[in-house]
Amino acid sequence: MDCNCFDPLLPADELLMKYQYISDFFIAVAYFSIPIELVYFVQKSAVFPYRWVLVQFGAFIVLCGATHLINLWTSTPHTRTVAMVMTTAKFSTAAVSCATAVMLVHIIPDLLSVKTRELFLKNKAAELDREMGLIRTQEETGRYVRMLTHEIRSTLDRHTILKTTLVELGRALQLEECALWMPTRTGVELQLSYTLHHQNPVGFTVPIQLPVINQVFSANCAVKISPNSAVARLRPTRKYIPGEVVAVRVPLLHLSNFQTNDWPELSPKSYALMVLMLPSNSARQWHVHELELVDVVADQVAVALSHAAILEESMRARDLLIEQNVALDLARREAETAVRARNDFLGVMNHEMRTPMHAVVALSSLLQESELIPEQRLMVETILKSSNLLATLINDVLDLSRLEDGSLQLDVGTFNLHALFREVLNLIKPVAAVKKLFVTLSLSSDFPEVAIGDEKRLMQILLNVVGNAVKFSKEGSVSVSAVNAKSESLIDPRAPEFFPVQSENHFYLRVQVKDTGSGINPQDFPKLFCKFAQNQEPATKNSAGTGLGLAICKRFVNLMEGHIWIESEGVGKGSTAIFIVKLGIPGRLNESKLPFTAGLPANHMQMTFQGLKVLVMDDNGFSRMVTKSLLVHLGCDVTTIGSGDECLRILTREHKVLIMDASITGMNCYDVAVSVHEKFGKRLERPLIVALTGNTDQVTKENCLRVGMDGVILKPVSIDKMRSVLSGLLEHGTVL
């Protein structure tokens, strides 16, 4: 039997029931949709710490929705089954609700702590945002610094550097004005040198001792200063509030080796002043990163300015060096011109002096061999010795000139070393005998008899050194000793740079000349080897000499890779001259092309040349006559001519010797020699060709030999010298 517990509803109640039906339906739909949404988003979330709470909460919502849905059938008469379902649903909802409420007691504190952590994370996020802002600011500052550094370093012109700095700072920091004050040369004022908006700023100056300037110069970073300070009054007067102003010092680095002319004389601490102004009537202020940017740029400008100063000074030094090089080159050319003029003058004087000397020596030697009374013979010998002394003096001057310009070369040949020493002693002994000096010669047992070197220069050294010993000795003795020097005897402690090296192909000749003469004052040692310098002691003032001997000897010794020095214990205690020269050993060098210049045998001195046909070519009639006289005296059949053309016309195979003056005008002697070779062809059919010259240079000798001449004779020529020349020609076919 059905149970009907409800009374029939009125029409108004039916309307209310419809609204309740609709409300319960939508409540149920909402309750059912919420768990679906929760499940969807929880699955999308990677981390969710309260999944069981979510399950309980979802069950609670679903049961609540179920009660509202079941309630649709309980508003009208219903069966017992519906009542049981409704009761079960409500009981389940109550159980789940209580369990969820109990669980929330434990969860709510965690949820509150989550909120706290959320606030903490928000604070951390804000702090990270600030740090990121600082990093971005630093990166931006670094970018500006790199950009400014690149612009500044792109040039080394300091005006461009400073102008670029102001322009780039103005663009980067959006400045209204930027100015640079440089110290004046006096260093007591700062002068306005560069501004951002004025191409040619008026040179305002302010005292460097102003408090605001001292404040900036004493700080290591940019400093805010008053917009009304003296260095900041660069903007036009307006009613707007002026923007903030900062100033920073720019170190002018001290450069000890460089000084720019239009910069001040820098002290160890000298600064320029850079002033930067923000736009007027703006609320903008200077930030820390902007001030840091200004500091970095100031340091970069200081470095760039130092580089620019170095470059400017280097360019100035380069220009000065170029000017000095031009002046030196001009001086060198003038010196070379002077040397050439001197050499030309000496060459001309040498030739012009030797030509008349040739006549004096030749005629004096002819007179010497004639029948003369003792007084006449003495006068002739005096004339001959004086002429030879004059010739020696000319040779000394020419040799010294060539030694100084490096044109003198050794005439190397094979010679008899023993004969050379004996000849020197034979020349010195007559002078020593007059002064009653005892002269001795000592040659070591291992002393080589034959050597390779310049015999003439070695004899000149010996004659000078031994001659000085005789000249400055009034009594006593002069001893000459020569040894084949060993390593221990080659060292002079006063000349450590002289370090000879022994070899199998060479040996070192050590000559010592000791006398008992006037000695040497220690203060005169530095002047001994200077040209035209002589000992100033009273005992030696009257001694003859030009002061060239030892100077030339030293240069000859140096050419022979040797060393020369003089020792003396003082005035009146004598002196010892020692020299070492390097000579070659025959048989161990390739001396096949070296001439042998040993002395001629004595019987050559007595030879006559009766009937020897000789042709003499000289355009100087006086010199031609003198040469002819010498040859006629020797018994030669002499023909004289004055030109090269005449020589080639007259010269025949009957002529055995052709003597030509090397300085003949017109067809010169070289052309004549070449023509003679062409005319006669074979060597045995042509005459022997000899040049007679007053030029002592090696070039003349080489030119003569190059064109096929057989020898060169240097003026002046005595009868003995002419006899030796002819003997050498006829015996060896050459004379050097």
Swiss-Prot record:
- Expression tissues: Leaves, flowers and fruits.
Indicate where this protein resides in the cell: Endoplasmic reticulum membrane
Q: Which domain of life is it from?
A: Eukaryota
Q: Please name the PROSITE patterns in this protein's record.
A: HIS_KIN, RESPONSE_REGULATORY
Q: Can the keyword Kinase be found in this entry's annotation?
A: yes
Enzyme Commission number, as recorded: 2.7.13.3
The free-text function statement in the UniProt record for this protein reads: May act early in the ethylene signal transduction pathway, possibly as an ethylene receptor, or as a regulator of the pathway.
Q: Which family does it belong to?
A: Belongs to the ethylene receptor family.
Q: What is this protein called?
A: Ethylene receptor 2
Highest classification ranks of the organism: Eukaryota, Viridiplantae, Streptophyta, Embryophyta, Tracheophyta
